[in-house]
Amino acid sequence: GIHRDAIAIPMGQGHQYSGDVADGFGINVMELLPNKMDNAGNLTFVGTQAELKMVNEKSYTVNTDGNARQLGRNIAAATTVEKLTKGEEHHGTHARPSEFYPDRSETAGYYKPYKWGMTIDLDRCNGCSACVVACYAENNLPVVGKMRTAIGREMSWLRMERYIEGKGDDYETRFTPMLCQQCGNAGCETVCPVYATYHNPEGLNAMVYNRCVGTRYCSNNCAYKVRRFNWFDYEFPAPLDQQLNSTITTREVGVMEKCTFCVQRINNAKHDANNLGRDLEDGEVMTACQQTCPTKAITFGNLMDPESQVAKQALRNDQENRDRQYEVLAELNYKPAITYLKKVNTREIDDHDSSHQGNENQKNHA
């Protein structure tokens, strides 16, 4: 959050000599700052006195995180040091519901020897969005701009959700990276009429782009709203085309896409390991978001390897993290492959103001 009586302005726009791509977009806020230097001879960005005035012009802001309040959905969960110390946090958890059909792990051909999974530690995540940028660069995601994002046509596979907990002056900001959960009981797979999205033997919710006919049923049935539809054939004008990842299939108009757990990296590592006559070892495969995270909040690996770091953090018998483990929207029984670890606070945040429904969504997710 922003301190009361303080103004925060993003920088980096309003370029005049950046070519066809970035020239003329936005406003250069540097022109608003006085020409003051600190003791080191650098421009002073903080501590500048400013005044806000109403003008007869309108503008709008765009974000991709939706509602700023959780409304009791426990998406960005938190606990306290006291609860963890006394073991109170674990008392409120429940066992998974019993299943009528056998789990895929009991089916021949599934999850042997790999089942890919991820853990995200919300106590480490500071919302810097480096993971989002890394995903764009790794997977050739197009930047659609402000206008298309405003109508729900953003193409980011990973978004940083921000939630405000508390009321009055007693509040905190929580960040939750949200991406495809690679569900073991995914709602998207059952509604695709052409089998373009399916559950592969390694636990990935895979995509076959050539099969997709763009019904968008999968997006409608995704509770996490992480699927993206190509409304256009997005172009990368020169020289931006030279920065594209050649190991990634280029998607065309009318095709749905989403996070793949960087399957291209998995396949490359498996190929190298196969040449050496062995299975992959823990840590050999890193997703782009994991590799870029400066706080190491993301852990990725093979859940079938009990000695892997991700398995130790995600398994229910993990003594260190079991009181912090949870799955987003677990009540839907989608069996996501991503386990979140609760943020740890030093005190309880009072958030029982049920009458406050938060901000309305500034945009609709496509």
Predicted features by range, described:
Residues 1-38, 44, 214-225, 289-299, ...:
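C-terminal, active-site-flanking charged/polar segments
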Residues 1-117, 123, 134-137, 141, ...:
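Long, contiguous, secondary-structure-rich segments that constitute the structural scaffold
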Residues 2, 13-16, 137, 141, ...:
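Short, well-ordered loop/turn and helix-capping segments at boundaries between secondary-structure elements
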Residues 100-127, 159-187, 193-217, 228-288:
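Ferredoxin-like iron-sulfur electron-transfer modules
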Residues 257-366:
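Long, compositionally biased charged/polar accessory segments in the mid-to-C-terminal portions
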